[in-house]
């Protein structure tokens, strides 16, 4: 399958540059792939029209690290880093700006005199070794929230709150699992009042989620691994919910990939604990969804693995016709944009 089949033209004016005024106030497009119907809601809070106590909602509670860092090169140039994964107390994978000019052995001066050296390099991806142990407080103090490059404005303090979910808990993501940004504490209270169960897994968002597909053929894309955690108690609740016939609603593609990677359809059990996945779901792969019944997600970038996953879940033609309708109706796209609820998969 050709990657360009997942391209679409989007007016720049529809790329959300700021979050909605309040969490939950974004618009919601609802897709029913089986009936081939599309519904429109003026607020994500209206999700209650489509779910009930027979729904079990599962979220990704990874917290975004302030992973955009700036350092001075030996030549005095300002170099930007995006910290990805911690692989040791003083070792991280990262992306580096002006990558063609940066070579193994280069040393950079970070805030507080911390020095970092490139140990290895693969295109713009590097392994960075600091001359001291680095804890999360350091990034919290000196880093910046890594808002995506299509948000073309200066860094704003609002991003420190709104690019993070209200339930984020474990630091490790280099980008937000943006589907969760729509859910307010009030909406969680409403779930509880309506006896709608929910729980959390943790998948740290990295290159596997946000790296674009650059190969001409979809099948040739190299999906990066991302780490995730499913606790025993969460797995038990999920398994019981499925056994009782409840619909499993995944909040975001990251959550879906973790669940689908870990679930054994024969044993009807999850593998629990720390794991990793490079699961790449796309139309034409004939992937059979084992566990997730419903998907809540954002409107994704062209030719992204996220758009391909949604296209596999709901049907490529139906998804692209819904995107066309969203554009015509002025929906906002990408991280701070509006949301989509897919009621079932094909």
Curated annotation (Swiss-Prot):
The keyword Nucleus does not apply. Monomer. The lineage of its organism: Bacteria, Pseudomonadati, Spirochaetota, Spirochaetia, Spirochaetales. Pfam families: Queuosine_synth. NCBIfam families: PRK00147.1, queA. The gene is queA. It comes from Borrelia garinii subsp. bavariensis (strain ATCC BAA-2496 / DSM 23469 / PBi). SUPFAM superfamilies: QueA-like. InterPro entries: QueA, QueA_dom1, QueA_dom2, QueA_sf. It comes from the Bacteria. It is found in: Cytoplasm. GO terms for molecular function: S-adenosylmethionine:tRNA ribosyltransferase-isomerase activity. This is S-adenosylmethionine:tRNA ribosyltransferase-isomerase. It catalyses: 7-aminomethyl-7-carbaguanosine(34) in tRNA + S-adenosyl-L-methionine = epoxyqueuosine(34) in tRNA + adenine + L-methionine + 2 H(+). HAMAP family: QueA.
